[in-house]
Amino acid sequence: MNELNSVVDSAKAAFEQARTPADLENAKALFLGKSGRITELMKGMAALAVDEKKTRGAAINLAKQAIEVALNNRRQALADAELQAQLQAEALDVTLPGRQRGQGSLHPVSLTLERIEAIFGSMGFDVAQGPEIESDWFNFTALNTPEDHPARSMHDTFYVEGGTATAPNLLRTHSSPMQIRYAVQHVKRHRAAVGVGQVEGLFSGDMPEIRVIAPGRTYRVDSDATHSPMFHQCEGLWVGENVSFKDLKFVFTDFCRTFFESDDLVLRFRPSFFPFTEPSAEIDIQFQSGPLAGRWLEVAGSGQVHPNVIRNMGLEPEKYIGFAFGMGPDRLAMLRYGVNDLRLFFDGDVRFLSQFQ
């Protein structure tokens, strides 16, 4: 029995010295393997009497069980130690400051467009979106732009495949074509509602006013610090029976003061020329404070809608009158955020764009 106790003690000591699962398996082989100590003891029972075999075998089995218990205990201890080491290596100190994750945000021009839409929406204007590939008729002819106008030149306009020789397709040079599209659909809907149907000729009956802005991307052959071949425009239109230039002044003054959050902002309307409005005016603003104080800055073009354009909307110009305006959201964003180079908005530099979050 002393011999068996010695074997069990030796096995326990060997198991305790094992520092890895591999070491433990090697120690196991010394005592429980095919050539291990327990196997040798079992082989030595061959020369014993039957009664001695029973006694000796039972004692050896008890010793084997004690060794297996010690083996399993050590195996579990090594597994626990390995898990603990892994947990410590992967531990997260919740008291440490978190890592700042950058959050995306809208582009400054998109923020400007949203602001424009919200302000005009509060004044009762609809927002209309239209195709960026436009026909020559909607982009020029319907807006009273003559065929020999410089804007139709390939030096100023991107022409694209499609269309016909007399009516080519192009990338729209302004978002005004959507005003025509919106007005034509507005008149058609009202004709149907009042039962006029497809009667030929201009509409001269009573009709709800047309109030709409058309923001979107536009394209021209131009590129410098203040111009881009792709830029944004927002055109506005208000047509009714009693709309005057006074309404234009009121609407745009209220818009500018709301947009720039400045009640002391001063506006002036300078006489100008646009083929689709008559009379026409450039709109300048003057800040009374800040880095731009005292300077006149051009922000929009405007005017009373030309009678030919009213006709192209399907309306009778002797009854309906209105005003239109067009401004550059990119330009407004430059003024609002103090940016000097328009190209910065479109270079995709995250260091620049992240300032507007």
UniProtKB/Swiss-Prot annotation:
<keyword id="KW-0479">Metal-binding</keyword>
<protein>
    <recommendedName>
        <fullName>Phenylalanine--tRNA ligase alpha subunit</fullName>
        <ecNumber>6.1.1.20</ecNumber>
    </recommendedName>
</protein>
<dbReference type="GO" id="GO:0000049">
    <property type="term" value="F:tRNA binding"/>
</dbReference>
<keyword id="KW-0436">Ligase</keyword>
<dbReference type="GO" id="GO:0005737">
    <property type="term" value="C:cytoplasm"/>
</dbReference>
<dbReference type="GO" id="GO:0000287">
    <property type="term" value="F:magnesium ion binding"/>
</dbReference>
<keyword id="KW-0067">ATP-binding</keyword>
<comment type="similarity">
    <text>Belongs to the class-II aminoacyl-tRNA synthetase family. Phe-tRNA synthetase alpha subunit type 1 subfamily.</text>
</comment>
<keyword id="KW-0547">Nucleotide-binding</keyword>
<keyword id="KW-0963">Cytoplasm</keyword>
<dbReference type="InterPro" id="IPR045864">
    <property type="entry name" value="aa-tRNA-synth_II/BPL/LPL"/>
</dbReference>
<dbReference type="Pfam" id="PF02912">
    <property type="entry name" value="Phe_tRNA-synt_N"/>
</dbReference>
<dbReference type="InterPro" id="IPR022911">
    <property type="entry name" value="Phe_tRNA_ligase_alpha1_bac"/>
</dbReference>
<dbReference type="GO" id="GO:0005524">
    <property type="term" value="F:ATP binding"/>
</dbReference>
<dbReference type="InterPro" id="IPR004188">
    <property type="entry name" value="Phe-tRNA_ligase_II_N"/>
</dbReference>
<dbReference type="InterPro" id="IPR006195">
    <property type="entry name" value="aa-tRNA-synth_II"/>
</dbReference>
<keyword id="KW-0648">Protein biosynthesis</keyword>
<feature type="binding site">
    <location>
        <position position="278"/>
    </location>
    <ligand>
        <name>Mg(2+)</name>
    </ligand>
</feature>
<dbReference type="InterPro" id="IPR010978">
    <property type="entry name" value="tRNA-bd_arm"/>
</dbReference>
<dbReference type="GO" id="GO:0004826">
    <property type="term" value="F:phenylalanine-tRNA ligase activity"/>
</dbReference>
<comment type="subunit">
    <text>Tetramer of two alpha and two beta subunits.</text>
</comment>
<keyword id="KW-0460">Magnesium</keyword>
<keyword id="KW-0030">Aminoacyl-tRNA synthetase</keyword>
<dbReference type="InterPro" id="IPR002319">
    <property type="entry name" value="Phenylalanyl-tRNA_Synthase"/>
</dbReference>
<dbReference type="InterPro" id="IPR004529">
    <property type="entry name" value="Phe-tRNA-synth_IIc_asu"/>
</dbReference>
<dbReference type="GO" id="GO:0006432">
    <property type="term" value="P:phenylalanyl-tRNA aminoacylation"/>
</dbReference>
<dbReference type="Pfam" id="PF01409">
    <property type="entry name" value="tRNA-synt_2d"/>
</dbReference>
